[in-house]
UniProtKB/Swiss-Prot annotation:
Keyword check for Calcium: no
The organism's place on the tree of life at top rank: Viruses
Signal peptide interval: none
Localization of this protein: Virion; Host cytoplasm
Chief location bin: virion
The protein's name in its UniProt record: Minor outer capsid protein P9
Role summary: Minor outer capsid protein.
Entry's Gene Ontology cellular component terms: host cell cytoplasm; viral outer capsid
UniProt keyword list: Capsid protein, Host cytoplasm, Outer capsid protein, Virion
Coiled coil regions in record: none
Any one Pfam family match given in the protein's UniProt record, by short name: Phyto_Pns9_10
Organism: Wound tumor virus
InterPro entries in alphabetical order: Phyto_Pns9_10
Amino acid sequence: MSGKIQDGVAIRRMSDAILFFTNYTSRNLIDQRDITLSTLHTIRRNLGTCWSIALLNCWNETSSHAGVMRFILDIAFSLRFGDFTMLGACGNVDPFDDAGQIFLKSCKATGRNDSCFLTPSDNFGYYLVSFLNKEQLKCVVDMNVGIHNIEDIYVTRMESIMEFIYYYYTESGRDVVNWLEKLESADAGLAAHAKSKRLMRAEIDLIRREILERTRLFINNNRNSFHDHHRELVRRYRTIWADVISDGDVVEETSTEATTSAQHSTALSAELDEVDEYDHPNDGLLTFRREEDAASNLDSLLGSLSGEDAFQG
């Protein structure tokens, strides 16, 4: 199927995705699950097969970059067997003639320009495109067949997601200066959605720290899980991170993800407030809005899966 819509509608739909990830904070999928799933349900249905393109462009855009990464992190550390399907396309409708062009128009309409985009290396850029395109296809589960072996698919897809997170961690540590090449270095006078090199560097550093904290915590909390698929996932995560996280690095059993999240939030506020005072003395850059007009809550099926729209029958 292929249906094309007017640019005005297309821009609004793409802008909804940008806003969603601009507002997305760590653990939204856990702590604000109902409203997050409702909003995401609408966005994915509107974008259809352009979902991976929207994710790609939101990852590249500085104000929504952290939201995309934390959304992917929330999926990677979820114990719900169907959450990975949120990276899959919703339906097979292609609503836009040129999704990339629609994204650029959406950015222009909301005051974003070329200085609002990251510039990862060609190798990482190719990997990112390949990863998102692959997950858009492979994270869709056949309702007639896949539902019966959802646990096995869960382990395979989560391993793929964690491999991407690991690659992000290593590449952002090695090549972050080049990623920030197009960003402004001015101390003030930046557009509302722009971020200086210093501020974006601080955000990426915090994401990298969160990746390590949550990976250690997930391994620690689930290595003795009663569910064999969760134990298998822990084994694969440990293999992926073997050169970074050793057995001695695993946190104590008494630690909780909520504690880690609170510590991370405190660090985020302290570090970014310091940077923001220097780079953005007047704009409300770090004020996260909450959408109050989300659609009604999804069916309880979303408690274990990510909604019927993720499946193809």
